[in-house]
Curated annotation (Swiss-Prot):
One Pfam family per UniProt: Ribosomal_L6
InterPro entries: Ribosomal_uL6-like, Ribosomal_uL6-like_a/b-dom_sf, Ribosomal_uL6_a/b-dom, Ribosomal_uL6_bac-type, Ribosomal_uL6_CS
One of the protein's GO biological processes: cytoplasmic translation
UniProt keyword list: Ribonucleoprotein, Ribosomal protein, RNA-binding, rRNA-binding
Name of protein: Large ribosomal subunit protein uL6
Family assignment from sequence similarity: Belongs to the universal ribosomal protein uL6 family.
């Protein structure tokens, strides 16, 4: 049985939740989100808590049970608090700045790398730190991964773009023969 699916979700102030058939509608201060469950789980909304139940006892139904509960929880947390990812740029001459609706980065290529900032996402650059904020956990993680992919950290000097909490395993360079 799913241990994740069993836990009810407390709905915080500032977030409204309504159920319409197999759809769950979430309304926050700034935006609205919806989650379609396609009838794979039963949805119960009562007294400021949202809970899910299995439709039947098949393994696939139990997997959906925990998945939809986690997705709903991520939407509620995103609408009430938001999600943040922080990237660090390390390297001589590597820098980033925001111009208009684009993130411009100098990453050692012969051209600047330009990444368009999607709607619903806030980005800020402070020295060599890029901060990405938004309500959609999946989107924030995807954007951070795409930016990191332009210049992932290399193991010898640690140059590149890395997550702020990422540890780079460093390698020793070549040793000379004597």
């Amino acid at each position: 049985m799913s241990r994740v699916g069993k836990k009810p979700i407390n709905i915080p102030k500032g977030v409204e939740v309504s159920v319409q058939g197999s759809k769950i509608l979430f309304k926050g201060a700034k935006e609205q989100k919806e989650l379609e469950t396609y009838g794979r789980v039963q949805i119960h909304l009562q007294d400021g808590t949202l809970s899910f139940a299995c439709v039947d006892s098949q393994a696939q139904s139990r997997a959906y049970w925990g998945t939809y509960r986690a997705l709903a929880n991520n939407i509620i947390v995103g609408l009430s608090q938001g999600f943040t990812k922080v990237l660090e740029i390390n390297g001589v001459g590597y820098k980033a700045n925001i111009s208009g609706k684009n993130l411009e980065m100098a990453l050692g290529f012969s051209h600047p790398v330009i990444y368009p900032i999607p709607a619903g996402v806030e980005m800020s650059v402070d020295k060599n730190t890029i901060t990405i904020k938004g309500a959609d956990k999946q989107q924030i993680g995807q954007i951070a991964a795409e930016i990191r992919k332009f210049r992932p950290p290399e193991p010898y000097k640690g140059k590149g773009i890395k997550y702020s909490d990422e540890m780079i395993v460093r390698k020793a360079g070549k040793t000379s023969k004597k």
